[in-house]
């Protein structure tokens, strides 16, 4: 005890070296902090470089610019059925007309999905007895039909052929058609075309249980000289959304 006390009081005695334990503890923490900072900077640079690449890739995807986007009400581009297919909600039907003869009245349809051109997914069904397509779930649907005809008697027959879509329950007391199409046939002459084609489609709000039937009407002068082209006259629909955009016609509002 006396030796330690004397050495500490002697001004000429050399000072003991500073303890290194604290410096050894500080140095590793400084290195770790520096490494973490470098890693954070590297990660930030990687994110910065990746963001422009992701945006550029999204813009470059084929067809993305042309695909329609669901807006309010009638702005849904009903004249672009191919684009609306991008929006369909898994419910799709396409039926093919059975009879080729131009007989006025409700059309009968092939509904077996195993047949060419026929599709019928869950939530949709066809009633043979009433010749109607039945919708099980409410929503906004794009409904369409296509009419194709061919001349079977050369140089004869003109006029027009019409299709009209009717809904049950009825839209109104008058029972106006929800969708209509008229195809004018070329005149009976040697230069006339021997085929005719028409397409019509529309967005409709359909209720659960809604039934859709198509009626054919032909002018008498065309009935014997023209027929439906086999497999080319179709009725179809697909659901775009279960929501009802403002301003869209409903089954009971017209």
Curated annotation (Swiss-Prot):
Q: Offer one example of a GO biological process linked to this entry.
A: positive regulation of activated T cell proliferation
Quote the cellular component terms of the Gene Ontology held in the record: extracellular space; plasma membrane
GO molecular function per UniProt? cytokine activity; signaling receptor binding; tumor necrosis factor receptor binding; tumor necrosis factor receptor superfamily binding
| Pfam families the record matches | TNF
Q: Does the keyword Cell inner membrane apply?
A: no
The record places the following residue ranges in the Cytoplasmic compartment, namely 1-28
- According to Swiss-Prot or TrEMBL, what is its membrane topology? Single-pass type II membrane protein
Classification via SMART domains: TNF
Q: Which UniProt keywords apply?
A: Cytokine, Membrane, Signal-anchor, Transmembrane, Transmembrane helix
Tell me where it resides. Membrane
InterPro entries given in the database record: TNF_CS, TNF_dom, TNFSF9, Tumour_necrosis_fac-like_dom
Residue ranges constituting the THD domain according to the UniProt record = 91-240
Expression sites by tissue: Expressed in brain, placenta, lung, skeletal muscle and kidney.
Query: What parts of the sequence cross the membrane?
Result: 29-49
Q: Which Gene3D superfamilies match?
A: 2.60.120.40
Signal sequence, start to end: none
- Recorded superkingdom: Eukaryota
Q: Does the keyword Membrane apply?
A: yes
**Extracellular topological segments:** 50-254
User: Subunit structure, per the record?
Assistant: Homotrimer.
Known role = Cytokine that binds to TNFRSF9. Induces the proliferation of activated peripheral blood T-cells. May have a role in activation-induced cell death (AICD). May play a role in cognate interactions between T-cells and B-cells/macrophages.
Q: Which family does it belong to?
A: Belongs to the tumor necrosis factor family.
Q: What is this protein called?
A: Tumor necrosis factor ligand superfamily member 9
């Amino acid at each position: 005890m006396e030796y330690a006390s004397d050495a500490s009081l002697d001004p000429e005695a050399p000072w003991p070296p500073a303890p290194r334990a604290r410096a050894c503890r500080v140095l590793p923490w400084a290195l770790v902090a520096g490494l973490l900072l470098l890693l954070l900077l590297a990660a930030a640079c990687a994110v910065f470089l990746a963001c422009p690449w992701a945006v550029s890739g999204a813009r470059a995807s084929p067809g993305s610019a042309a695909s329609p986007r669901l807006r309010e009400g009638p702005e849904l581009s009903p004249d672009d059925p191919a684009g609306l297919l991008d929006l369909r909600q898994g419910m799709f039907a396409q039926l093919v007309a059975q009879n080729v003869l131009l007989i006025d009245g409700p059309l009968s349809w092939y509904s077996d999905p195993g047949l060419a051109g026929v599709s019928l997914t869950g939530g949709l069904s066809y009633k043979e007895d009433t010749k109607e397509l039945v919708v099980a779930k409410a929503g906004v649907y794009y409904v369409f039909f296509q009419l194709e005809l061919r001349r079977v008697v050369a140089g004869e027959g003109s006029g027009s052929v019409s299709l009209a879509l009717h809904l049950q329950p009825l839209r109104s007391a008058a029972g106006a058609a929800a969708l209509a199409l008229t195809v004018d046939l070329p005149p009976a002459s040697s230069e006339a075309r021997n085929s005719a084609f028409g397409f019509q489609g529309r967005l409709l709000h359909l209720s659960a249980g809604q039934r859709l039937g198509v009626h054919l009407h032909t002018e008498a002068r065309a009935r014997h000289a023209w027929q439906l082209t086999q497999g080319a006259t179709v009725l179809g629909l697909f659901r775009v959304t279960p929501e009802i955009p403002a301003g869209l016609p409903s089954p009971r509002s017209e």
